[in-house]
Amino acid sequence: GASGLAQVLGYVRKSFGIAPGAEVTTESNPESTSPEFFEGLLEAGYTRVSLGMQSASSRVLQVLERRHTPGRPVDAAKEARAAGFEHVNLDMIYGTPGETDDDVRATLEAVLAAEVDHVSAYSLIVEDGTAMARKVRRGELRVTDEDVLASRYALIDGVLSVAGFDWYEVSNWARPDGECRHNLGYWRDHDWWGAGPGAHSHLGDRRFFNVKHPARYTQHCTAGALPIAEEEHLSPHDRHVEKVMLGLR
């Protein structure tokens, strides 16, 4: 809950400090939030909230195995704004098997009704080993055609652009001054530290990620050892290519 997130941020502030005016974002599932939750986050020092909306269609949410009701993300976003958050994001997923253009339009209408300043829209990726992948393999679900995905993306961009959102990154739209700073940091080749099981870090020419299992991660940390699972050093050429690629987003 908010108290746990407040403790984490307090530890970061005490150990490393937080720059004045820093963007401090947390992500939540809509069904796990409340007005008191958002008030606690704001009091703790969080400045931005991202909510996993996915879709306004109950049928699509069922396929995605999401637990919230179609209207909960909009209510949660309004609660966050009422608590005092200026920056609120809603995440959309498009291309779910069985989704229609009307489903996407309804989701966009709900997004605009929420009066958020940032929207992320991601094409569904069916990951190997998931229940959805097994259903696709058995023929119970059908993967959305790439041409349909392209038309849905154009639909999303068109609706958001007319509503005053600026497309500033391949999957992200924002109102003026609503751009996500940590998103921009990724694409501008900034450095970042990742803390926690499976977290990735980017420091100059070094790329590494932590062990994924929480118990193993804890064992490393309590033993005073870095919990790094794998590490990669990029050559100057690889860094240049990566910077160009990231800049194209």
Q: What do the PLM-derived regions correspond to, one by one?
A:
Residues 1-249:
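C-terminal scaffold of the Radical SAM
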